[in-house]
């Protein structure tokens, strides 16, 4: 199985399965002498880890990361950074009844068809458990960005749960820590609690929309034609489990705009720098960053692991009904927020290093 790595100069490769002994990753391309500790990585892992409230899976994994290589006396050495997280709360028996049955909406059947073998315990390699290592890699990417692009910040939020979207006029980043949804609209978050409680108690699930904003991005990241920044961001976000759609800036809404409405007009500022009067493009033009906020939204489907019986087939070709047991998120979009932030960080770090490797000559 190929396709376990992401990036070019800043590159990470993940390994491990949901119910295996551990998950891990190897991060390459990190410059030497960048301060890095396990606590730096743990800070972001704690934002993603399961079992923190009733709205996420009750699988309780501490997600304690160990740095195995590439760091000496608190500084990166420039060599590969090896990271490991041990799995401690697997319940493989929850999946015994479906080991020969394909769960609708999951990767079970296609894995079996492609490889002739699959780890049925929690989805194996296709499990969102893998995303913990993306968050770990993203924490390192943030340290690279801190060193090479001071002032660059990345923040993510959940802006829609099912059909219920936030009121953008009430957007307040300070609200993110006041609710379990990473929601910037406090009033919306309160209504979501009751809504998701109903979904959760019924054994069902619901999707959502996540928005990630990177501020302070330098001008000039990305390159035509096939190395566009937005193309790589789309790939990064689409690679996250359960993501079924990605848009940059106004995205699909731009299709309904006129040319006059959509174009981000430009003016010279009092500081002598070029400024924009709007940001419909989401901070990227021609695949190259403009210096404005880079804005990405992703649509996250509802998890297919629900109690409601669904029609499927088994390995012997019989028609069956499947009701998925185990511990699952009623809305996976919640924990997708720190994962999306991490993929934004990894993509920007990679493009920043690539840009520095090909400087413009005076």
Curated annotation (Swiss-Prot):
Pathway assignment: Metabolic intermediate biosynthesis; chorismate biosynthesis; chorismate from D-erythrose 4-phosphate and phosphoenolpyruvate: step 7/7
Residues where FMN binds: 125-127, 241-242, 286, 301-305, 327
KW Amino-acid biosynthesis (keyword) present: yes
GO molecular function: chorismate synthase activity; FMN binding
Reactions catalysed: 5-O-(1-carboxyvinyl)-3-phosphoshikimate = chorismate + phosphate
Binding locations of NADP(+): 48, 54
GO cellular component, one term: cytosol
Domain of life: Bacteria
Keywords: Amino-acid biosynthesis, Aromatic amino acid biosynthesis, FAD, Flavoprotein, FMN, Lyase, NADP
Cofactor(s) needed for function: FMNH2
EC number: 4.2.3.5
Gene3D superfamilies: Chorismate synthase AroC
Subunit description: Homotetramer.
Annotated HAMAP family: Chorismate_synth
Family classification: Belongs to the chorismate synthase family.
Protein name in the entry: Chorismate synthase
Origin species: Paramagnetospirillum magneticum (strain ATCC 700264 / AMB-1) (Magnetospirillum magneticum)
Taxonomic lineage from the root: Bacteria, Pseudomonadati, Pseudomonadota, Alphaproteobacteria, Rhodospirillales
